[in-house]
Regions:
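Catalytic cores of carbohydrate-active enzymes across secretory and cytosolic contexts
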Residues: 1-320
Length: 320
């Protein structure tokens, strides 16, 4: 199998803040575009499409890119369109009511870990059924108003797309994602700097930048090692879903489990139940054992506590 990789990873990535050029009357569109709620709201997608139907198709139905590229004269025209503004206000009112409903405090809160999430085609952090299930799980948790947080990876390339060579061989095409054109946001500290999670590996440290995708009411925190703090070798950890050799795969699983727990700790997030979707994140429970023992419990007590507050979903119950 041939592998074709985009050269987009060659430059050093810098943070550049691009302010929206939206007129004040249309600011609600930007807020809704940054929450993946639109991906399962037909009214929201219809609203975005109506801004510029031809451009909506060109940007592959990505509302972030739509708002970046739409002509300013068109925006000024829309800002005076009473019918459009009324529809926008109606969709936004539904969105706001949805987002402000408080979860039932009597229900257990959940931290969910998964290697991939199929939320929408514009966010390439999934490959197939496992990711689609995880994405639907978050959407249903949001609709059911479960107090949930999720952890995963922000892949620079995601999963490859397939093409065929002249002699019929598969070519794996990896295309870099431009994170600033996706429905995600940097997680910032009180000084306005992106939060970095320092993850101790044996004999070295990996530094993961934190991003957040808002999946309705559910925050999905995404770890990203493709930054200047890491060696070129370790930047690759989050380059591709299920990519690289076995060493890179174990680094990924270590980062998801150990790094994911450290990320939640850094954000001050604690949940009642920790759910691993497949074994990729199983090391999160090792980190939890360490934390409980360091807090004063003996190993047996810590083990019982972890066992009682863990969920595990397996998708391949036979050797594969």
């Amino acid at each position: 199998m041939n592998v074709k990789v985009s050269n987009a990873n060659q430059p050093t990535w810098k943070i550049v803040t691009v302010k929206s050029h939206l007129p004040e009357a249309l600011k609600k569109l930007d807020e809704m575009a940054h929450n993946l709620w639109w991906s399962w709201s037909a009214d929201a997608r219809t609203l975005f499409r109506s801004l510029d139907e031809e451009l909506w198709k060109k940007v592959d139905k990505n509302p972030i890119e739509l708002l970046r590229r739409i002509d300013y004269d068109r925006l000024k025209e829309l800002s005076k369109d009473k019918e459009l503004l009324a529809r926008m206000d109606k969709v936004y009112a539904d969105f706001h009511a949805y987002m402000t409903e408080k979860p039932n405090a009597k229900r257990a809160s959940v931290a969910y870990f998964c290697m991939e999430y199929g939320l929408n085609h514009v966010l390439k952090i999934y490959s197939g059924g496992l990711g689609i299930l995880a994405g639907d799980y978050l959407k249903e948790a949001s609709d059911s108003n479960v107090d949930m947080v999720a952890v995963g990876f922000l892949y620079r390339y995601g999963y490859f797309t397939q093409s065929l060579s002249m002699d019929g061989q598969q070519i794996a095409n990896y295309e870099a994602q431009d994170f600033d054109r996706l429905p995600i946001e940097r997680v910032l500290d009180k000084d306005g700097n992106q939060v970095i999670v320092d993850v101790p590996y044996p004999n070295f440290m990996v530094h993961a930048a934190l991003w957040r995708a808002n999946v309705g009411r559910v925050p999905l925190y995404l770890l990203d090692t493709d930054n200047e703090l890491n060696s070129e070798y370790d930047r690759r950890i989050t380059h591709a879903l299920y990519g690289g050799d076995w060493e890179n795969r174990i680094k990924q699983e270590y980062l998801l489990g150990i790094g994911g727990m450290l990320a939640l700790q850094k954000l001050g997030i604690k949940k009642d139940v920790y759910h691993c979707n497949e074994g990729h994140a199983a090391l999160c429970n090792v980190q939890r054992l360490v934390d409980y023992v360091q807090s004063g419990l003996n190993f047996t007590e810590a083990l019982e506590l972890v066992r009682a507050s863990s969920l595990y979903t397996v998708h391949t119950p036979v050797p594969a």
